[in-house]
Structures are given as structure tokens and as C-alpha cells.
């Protein structure tokens, strides 16, 4: 869930402390949730449920340029990459990525290529 705070005093000590604490807790949660063991188990659970494991909008969250990372996920059973996603919306945080870059990576490793539910325009 995302909440926006309009008209706030950004120097408010209570708000600053809350944000700092939340940031630390979030970082720990991310490390715990996305540890290697959990990703491997999640992919296995998806397969056991009859599904395909696809990494959603990979360039928004991961250093996809690192072959080692992609190969590791494939070794865990990754089936595909969400290729068709409006990456242009995230130009500020994504330096090199377009759908075509992700498509090339999927082709290189024989992964299926998908689009997400938030893809509303194929003019990527």
C-alpha cells in the first residue's frame, strides 16, 4: 500500500524517526523475503501449483544486466520474464532498459515472454 502525505512538515522529528525506522525494517524485510532460499522455494511452490514462474517487470527491481543473477533464477526453475511492461514510465530509475533489452535476455535463455496486467499500451 502506498500513502501520500500532502502539506507535511518534512522537518517534523516524529515523522523523520518514523520514516527512518520504517526504512530499516523494510530493508530487513526485503533481505529476508528475497533471500535465495525463499526465491527457490517460491518458484517450486508456483510449479507445484501448476503455474509458471515469471519475474515481473525485472528492470524495475533487479540488476538484470548481470547474467549471473538471471542464470541463478533459471537454475531455480524460472520460466519467463515480463517483457512487455511500460518501462518508459520509469526512465529516472532505469538507465538502460527497454522491452527490447528484456526480450533479448528472454530469447538468450529460452524464457517465455509475458506482459503484465498493467500493460495498457503496446507502444513501448
Show where each model-derived region lies.
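Histidine/acidic-residue-rich catalytic or RNA/ligand-binding cores of hydrolases
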Residues: 1-5, 63-71, 90-102, 122-124
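Extended substrate/RNA-proximal surfaces in nucleic-acid metabolism proteins
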Residues: 1-76
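Active-site beta-loop-alpha junctions enriched in small/polar residues
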Residues: 8, 58-60, 86-88, 118-122
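Helix C-cap/helix->beta junction micro-motif
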Residues: 49, 108-109
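Hydrophobic faces of well-ordered beta-strands that scaffold small-molecule active sites
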Residues: 53-56, 81-83, 113-117
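Structural recognition of alpha->loop->beta junctions
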Residues: 69-89
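Short acidic/histidine-rich active-site segments
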Residues: 110-124
Amino acid at each position: 500500500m502506498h500513502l501520500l502525505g500532502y502539506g507535511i512538515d518534512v522537518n517534523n522529528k516524529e515523522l523523520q524517526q518514523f520514516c527512518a525506522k520504517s526504512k530499516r525494517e523494510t530493508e530487513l524485510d526485503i533481505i529476508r523475503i528475497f533471500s535465495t532460499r525463499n526465491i527457490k522455494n517460491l518458484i517450486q511452490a508456483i510449479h507445484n501449483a501448476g503455474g509458471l514462474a515469471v519475474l515481473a517487470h525485472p528492470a524495475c527491481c533487479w540488476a538484470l544486466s548481470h547474467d549471473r543473477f538471471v542464470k541463478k533464477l533459471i537454475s531455480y526453475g524460472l520460466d519467463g520474464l515480463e517483457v512487455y511492461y511500460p518501462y518508459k514510465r520509469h526512465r529516472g530509475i532505469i538507465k538502460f532498459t527497454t522491452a527490447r533489452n528484456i526480450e533479448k535476455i528472454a530469447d538468450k535463455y529460452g524464457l517465455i515472454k509475458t506482459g503484465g496486467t498493467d500493460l495498457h499500451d503496446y507502444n513501448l
